Amino acid sequence: MVQYVTTRIDASFAALSDATRRGVLERLGRSDASITELADKFHMTLTGMKKHVGVLEQAGLVTTQKVGRVRTCRLGLRRLEEEAAWIERYRQLWDARFDELDKVIDELKQQEKANGRKPRE
């Protein structure tokens, strides 16, 4: 059986895979907020929001601090450089593949033109 090791990048992508968590990050990008404020904004229960914040916290994207009864959330110090580099590698790969596909399409159009066929658009 294959076993997979969860890495930091896996945790980040798992955290970012949910629209609510992406919204929380966007909201925290403007200013810190309590879990109660976030729950109200996203029309969720406190328990539901705590779970979302926990996932973001495990990925290092959010930090929380409890003062009295209020848990305040803020963006984590960790940036997404590793994730951006991973995405960039695949962007470059696909750009190269699409460039090659464009060349093949251009060659086929030239062949059709040379054979007297009406070129496709």
How would you describe each model-predicted region?
Residues A15-T20, L80:
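Short helix-coil-helix linker/hinge
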Residues M1-R8, R27-L46, V55-Q58, T63, ...:
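C-terminal regulatory/oligomerization modules of transcriptional regulators
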Residues K66-T72:
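Short, Lys/Arg-rich nucleic-acid/phosphate-binding segment
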Residues R22-V24:
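Pre-recognition alpha-helix immediately N-terminal to the DNA-recognition helix
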Residues T7-S17:
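Extreme N-terminal segment that seeds HTH/winged-HTH DNA-binding domains in transcriptional regulators
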